[in-house]
Amino acid sequence: MEKKAHFVKRDFPPREAPSLLLLLLVVAVLLLNALLYLYLGNLHGSSGRADAEPSLCPYGSFKLGPVKNCSPWLSCEAINREVRKLKCVGEGAVKKVFLSEWKENKVVISQLTKPELKEDFLHGLKMLKALQSKHVVRLLGYCEKQFTILTEYHPLGSLRGLNETLHIPKYKSMNTWHRRLMLAIDYVSIIRYLHSSPLGTLVMCDSNDLDKALSQYLLTSDFHILVNDLDALPLVNRSAGRLVKCGHRELWGEFVAPEQRWPYGEDVPFDDDLMPPYDEKTDIWKIPDVSNFFLGHVEGSDIVRLHLFDIHAACKKKDPAERPSAQEVLDTYKKVLTLLIREAAMPSTREML
C-alpha cells in the first residue's frame, strides 16, 4: 500500500509576528537617530563657518561672493578708490551707515557722525578686528584716519525686522518653531562666544531694551545671526577684580538685570560713582526675553517654551551667581531641539509599522 505524501502548511507561531514588528521598530529608531545625528550636525555646523574666520581666509583678509581668492582688508586708499556709496540706510548715535558697492558686490560703509564719540567708534573697530569669526559680521576694510569701516552687506537687515521678513512669501516656509529655535540657538551661541572670546569675557552692553538688543544683530540670507555692533563690549576680568558698568546713566525697566538698576531707591538721586559694577550674567538675564521674541507665536512655539521653562527660570534668578553660564543655556537649547525633532519624527516611524 503506497504512502501518500502529506504537505503540511506551517504558520509562524503567534509570538513571531510581534517579534518581527519589534525588530522593525528597533531598526527604524536606530535609523532615525542616525539621520537625526547627521541632520543636527549639519545644522549646528551649517552656520558653517569655523570659529576662527568666516571665509576661511588668513587673518586680515576676506573672500566675498563667488571669488575664490582672498583679498587683504581694504586700506584707506582702496576704499576711497574702489568703493562707491549708493545711499544712506541708517544712522545711530555713533555712526551713519551707507549701502555701497565694491567690484559689483554690495557692501556697507559705516562712518563716524559725532567726533566726540570717536573712542566708541574706534573701540568697535578694535573689537570687529579681534573677534572675526562665524558669529561676527565680516570685516572687509577700514580707515582709522577717516573713521570708516567697511563690512559685508546682509539685505535682510537687523533682527528688528524678523517677523516682517517671515511674512514675506519667499520666507514663509522658514516661519516654523524649528527655524525660530535655531535662531535662538544662534543668538545664545554669540553670547557664549563673547563670554569666552579671545580677548576674555565681554559683556554686550548695547542692550538696555529688546529693540536695542535686536538692532545689534543681523539676519543673514540663509537665516543665521551675526553680531554687527561691537561699540560697547567692556571686559570683565575677575582675577584683576574688574567688573563693568554699561554706561554712566541710570537704567530702568524689566529687560535689564536687577543688578543694573539703581539699588538705593527713588529717594536717593542716581550717582554713577555709587552705582555698583556687575559682570556678564546681565546678558544671561536677557536671554529668555530675546528668545521669546524669536519663538513668536507659530504652531509648536508654546511646546518649545514649555521645554525651556526651567532654564529660563534659572536665567531670571535675582542673584547673578545663581544664573547658568551661556554655555549651559546653549547646551540646554540644543538638547531641546534634538528632543523635539525626535518627537516630531516618531509618528512617522509608527506609521511605518
Swiss-Prot record:
Keywords linked to the UniProt accession: ATP-binding, Endoplasmic reticulum, Glycoprotein, Kinase, Membrane, Nucleotide-binding, Signal-anchor, Transferase, Transmembrane, Transmembrane helix
- The source's superkingdom equals Eukaryota
Listed SUPFAM superfamilies: Protein kinase-like (PK-like)
Output the Gene Ontology cellular-component terms: endoplasmic reticulum membrane
UniProt-annotated glycosylation sites, renumbered to this chain? 163, 237
**Topology feature Lumenal, residues:** 41-353
State the EC number(s). 2.7.1.183
Q: Name one GO biological process term.
A: protein O-linked glycosylation
Q: Where are the transmembrane segments?
A: 20-40
Give the similarity note. Answer: Belongs to the protein kinase superfamily. Ser/Thr protein kinase family. STKL subfamily.
Explain the purpose of this protein: Protein O-mannose kinase that specifically mediates phosphorylation at the 6-position of an O-mannose of the trisaccharide (N-acetylgalactosamine (GalNAc)-beta-1,3-N-acetylglucosamine (GlcNAc)-beta-1,4-mannose) to generate phosphorylated O-mannosyl trisaccharide (N-acetylgalactosamine-beta-1,3-N-acetylglucosamine-beta-1,4-(phosphate-6-)mannose). Phosphorylated O-mannosyl trisaccharide is a carbohydrate structure present in alpha-dystroglycan (DAG1), which is required for binding laminin G-like domain-containing extracellular proteins with high affinity.
Q: What is this protein called?
A: Protein O-mannose kinase
Q: What is the lineage of its organism?
A: Eukaryota, Metazoa, Chordata, Craniata, Vertebrata
Protein's gene? POMK
